[in-house]
Curated annotation (Swiss-Prot):
GO biological process: response to antibiotic; ribosome disassembly; translation
Sequence similarity: Belongs to the TRAFAC class translation factor GTPase superfamily. Classic translation factor GTPase family. TetM/TetO subfamily.
Highest taxon, organism lineage: Bacteria
InterPro entries reported in the protein's UniProt record: EF-G-like_DII, EFG_II, EFG_III/V, EFG_V-like, G_TR_CS, P-loop_NTPase, Ribosomal_Su5_D2-typ_SF, Ribsml_uS5_D2-typ_fold_subgr
GO function term, MF aspect, one: GTP binding
Record's keyword annotation contains Metal-binding: no
Positions annotated to bind GTP: 10-17, 74-78, 128-131
Protein name, as recorded: Tetracycline resistance protein TetS
Alphabetized PANTHER family for the sequence: RIBOSOME-RELEASING FACTOR 2, MITOCHONDRIAL, TRANSLATION ELONGATION FACTOR G-RELATED
Keywords: Antibiotic resistance, GTP-binding, Nucleotide-binding, Plasmid, Protein biosynthesis
Length: 641
């Protein structure tokens, strides 16, 4: 059986979930249509999704037409969840990009198209809601050409009367897009030779698969118009890259979620080989798992299966598998660019209103962060506060609401802050000697710190031989340095430097590893006080599209939001501004652009990394440590004079 995995992507309220329901209904997978308004759809599984009316997690469902099975990965529909969209995109054989006939191409449509094109995923445009009043399809076509791609082919004629309908007929002039992309067809066409439909369709299909041509279809998901035609094109024009002739297993974990009863569900896309129940499968060179339960979606229902073929999406109940784990042979994964998940850029503290629910809150955060790599948390070992880090404020809002609605925990949070980092300004060294006041520890340590280029991270080297200082003491120094790097002079994590352990001395038998572990962060702090540190903050690279008449305003406003414009380009009636901006400023700049362009701007961003900030006073309260703080303060007092 042929298996196709598709995604349905759209801006909010374009009708994505309704289209999924309509595909299931028209194919016979379900007997009645669900409704987003009433919360009865197949794919919006979480209570929170039903309440908000937008899809937040990724659900899997399927339908079958003749000998073709189509798995639908219903991707998230909110900007703060694009990282989840990227993860889902990696398993797709094709995508339906939904465009509202009334609203046309929206900002998020362009962002999604950009991601799909970057990952070389074939795209079918579906113009939805053609049964609404005031529809002008030629304007929508032009909107697609201006904002997405000229390489489209209109595959239907549409009658917009009181009861709209579509006819599968491609106007002759539409084939010109196909002809001009093929030298052989263009030559035949130029000299007046007849082109038969078979060779045109062959070229069309090849270009769709190579992501250089985008067919356009029409309909109304709500009223089931044009859906059967869409099913036909999905099953006939999209193909899976699975290696049907390979007996070597290869599958990739792209999603983790928890059921209402706490079972951990792992979603796997199989690319080659066959997986059987009770198989033992490699997930690394030294680790295997045994498949004890295996499920897949069959006609909209989750069913247990004994065997899974290449191309299938399966669900395993497993505690070991993590996101992006590969089952079997990694070499058989298709070569497709994986867009990197951005790092969390904001943080806050989160506590339950009732202290008795603290353990329950930690359990909830474990499940949520296990499913979403953009959400991280830790318990401060000194203050015992729960610190939550995340990508955007909507993500925080959804997480907090989820904790309240699914886990029934009332919580309190502080105002989010940007996650800064620190880097030394210059090379420095510092040594604290044994038995030299105020050092109370039976240890001597000498460290040097050297700044490294941005993005280098922390590097560590020990110049003290193991013959002179044994491994347990060396390990203790490393542990102390690791702890010391958690808090710089401003209270933020240190990065982009090399730390060298240059000197160590112990007294036998009184010295212990604990002496070195306690002293190392104090020496490190003094070295950083000599070098000084500079604050770094997360930066984004951006491409901003604005109509030409707003260029001056967009350009002049850049400095107000600390944006640095590096280049400009003209594209049709738009100007593209290319540059970089602090992550803390992007939302305000984006909101401003949206306001003064009346929603006609688009802002594409990717995490660039940490850059030097012009913020001078971004202090984070230092976490106390009763075992070393008194000594720290004494050394700080001495070195001030």
């Amino acid at each position: 059986m042929k298996i196709i995995n598709i995604g349905i992507l759209a801006h909010v309220d374009a009708g994505k979930t309704t289209l999924t329901e309509s595909l299931l209904y028209s194919s016979g997978a379900i007997k009645e249509l669900g409704s987003v308004d009433s919360g009865t759809t197949k794919t919006d599984t979480m209570f929170l999704e039903r309440q908000r009316g937008i899809t937040i997690q990724t659900a899997i469902t399927s339908f079958q037409r003749e000998n073709v099975k189509v798995n639908i990965v219903d991707t998230p529909g909110h900007m703060d969840f694009l990282a989840d969209v990227y993860r889902s995109l990696s398993v797709l054989d094709g995508a339906i990009l939904l465009i509202s006939a009334k609203d046309g191409v929206q900002s998020q449509t362009r962002i999604l198209f950009h991601a799909l094109r970057k990952m070389n995923i074939p795209i079918i445009f579906f113009i939805n809601k053609i049964d609404q009043n005031g529809i002008n399809l030629p304007d929508v076509y032009q909107d697609i050409k201006d904002k997405l791609s000229d390489d489209i082919i209109i595959k239907q004629t549409v009658n917009l009367n009181l009861k709209p309908y579509v006819i599968d007929y491609t106007e002759p002039e539409q084939w010109e897009t196909v002809i001009v992309g093929n030298d052989y067809l263009l030559e035949k066409y130029t000299i007046g030779k007849t082109l038969n439909i078979a060779e045109l369709e062959k070229e069309e299909n090849e270009r769709i698969q190579s992501c250089s041509l985008y067919p356009v279809y029409h309909g109304s998901a709500k009223n089931n118009i044009g859906i059967k035609q869409l099913i036909e094109v999905i099953t006939s024009k999209l193909f899976s890259p699975t290696q049907l002739n390979s007996d070597k297993l290869c599958g990739n974990v792209f999603k983790v979620e928890y059921s209402d009863d706490g079972q951990r569900l792992v979603y796997v896309r199989l690319y080659s080989g066959t997986l059987h129940l009770r198989d033992s499968v490699n997930i690394s060179e030294k680790e295997k798992i045994k498949v004890t339960e295996m499920y897949t979606s069959i006609n909209g229902e989750l069913r247990q299966i004994d065997k899974a073929e290449p191309g299938e999406i399966i669900i395993l109940k497993n505690e070991l598998l993590k996101l992006n784990n590969v089952l079997g042979d990694k070499k058989r994964l298709p070569h497709r660019e994986i867009l990197e998940n951005p790092l969390p850029m904001l943080q806050t503290t989160i506590e339950p209103c009732k202290s008795v629910q603290r353990e329950k809150l930690l359990d909830a955060l474990f499940e949520i962060s296990d499913s979403d790599p953009l959400l991280q948390y830790y318990v401060d070992t000194v203050t015992h506060e729960i610190v939550l880090s995340f990508l955007g404020e909507v993500q925080m809002e959804v997480t907090c609401t989820l904790i309240q609605e699914k886990y029934h925990i009332e919580i309190e949070t502080r105002k989010p802050t940007v996650i800064y980092m620190e880097r030394p300004l210059k090379k420095s060294e510092f040594t604290i000697d044994i038995e030299v006041p105020p050092n109370p520890f039976w240890a001597s340590i000498g460290l040097s710190v050297t700044p490294l280029p941005l993005g280098s991270g922390i590097q560590y080297e020990s110049l003290v031989s193991l013959g002179y200082l044994n491994q347990s003491f060396q390990n203790a120094v490393m542990e102390g340095i690791r702890y010391g790097c958690e808090q710089g002079l401003y209270g933020w994590k240190l990065t982009d430097c090399k730390i060298c352990f240059k000197y160590g001395l112990y007294y036998s038998p009184v010295s212990t590893p604990a002496d070195f572990r306690m002293l190392a962060p104090i020496v490190l702090e003094q070295a950083f006080r000599k070098s000084g540190t500079e604050l770094l903050e997360p930066y984004l690279s951006f491409e901003i599209y604005v109509p030409q008449e707003y260029l001056s305003r967009a350009y002049n406003d850049a400095s107000k939001y600390c944006a640095n414009i590096l280049n400009t380009k003209l594209k049709g009636n738009e100007v593209i501004l290319i540059g970089e901006i602090p992550a803390r400023c992007i939302q305000e700049y984006r909101n401003s652009l949206t306001f003064f362009t009346n929603g006609r701007s688009v802002c594409l961003t990717e995490l660039k990394g940490y850059q030097v900030t012009n913020i001078k006073s971004a202090f984070q309260p230092r976490r106390p440590n009763n075992r070393i703080d008194k000594v720290r303060h004494m050394f700080n007092k001495i070195n001030l004079h």
